């Protein structure tokens, strides 16, 4: 069952009407197929027009949709033979950041990403995708393995930001984020990062400092959440829509600013409406990018990463 966002209410009303008609038609001899088709066309057209004109704040809501596919969904539908690897070999395990060995279109890769969870229990277990120091150190360990064994690195970024708790600070959160970013930039193998939902602050950059950065059509990427920005500038989170507009958080804005390299189109109505379709589309896009990078020497890859970040804002 779809969970509707506030701006989707007209679509929700139409789809509810369609469901009522279908239910009423069961066992009824009256033919209402034409009316159903008319309403379905109207609903599809309304959904298309709504999603073709989303504001940055509405895109932020879509990026946070509770039914949006997360790391485990992409593992299930886009990758094969996933072997999870856990722990940072120093403090412990962090399930907000997952990783391991996987196969993408026959190519062995090291896969790393944020997992938010999809219900109360799993969200608590995965800490809502907010990585802790041990999570980023685990990512560093996996990137080191990738470099040693010549495996390309694929990252799926979806976090509101790194965990800001006192215990994370005590264990060196800032250092872990910085080291993870450094590990990305120093990799001697190809790296493709994708912002699949929220890309929040350094917690996202630590897994997204790649030579190729992709972004799903309705994902967002920023240094702070719109609510956080609004609270600082206007002393109220109610100005979040204005903050989202000003911060240029959308894939379309970030492509123009050369922060990302490619937008991956989502199904009409967002990735949550057809998770298997977006997984297939993203798998194809990542595979294409890895093909283009496969024969480049390590020094060239490192230089590409350095140059892409130095030219941002230039």
Swiss-Prot record:
Keywords: ATP-binding, Cytoplasm, Fatty acid biosynthesis, Fatty acid metabolism, Lipid biosynthesis, Lipid metabolism, Nucleotide-binding, Transferase. Its EC number is 2.1.3.15. One of its GO terms (molecular function) is ATP binding. Residues 38-292 form the CoA carboxyltransferase C-terminal domain. Transmembrane segments: none annotated. PROSITE patterns: COA_CT_CTER (PS50989). This is Acetyl-coenzyme A carboxylase carboxyl transferase subunit alpha. It comes from Erythrobacter litoralis (strain HTCC2594).
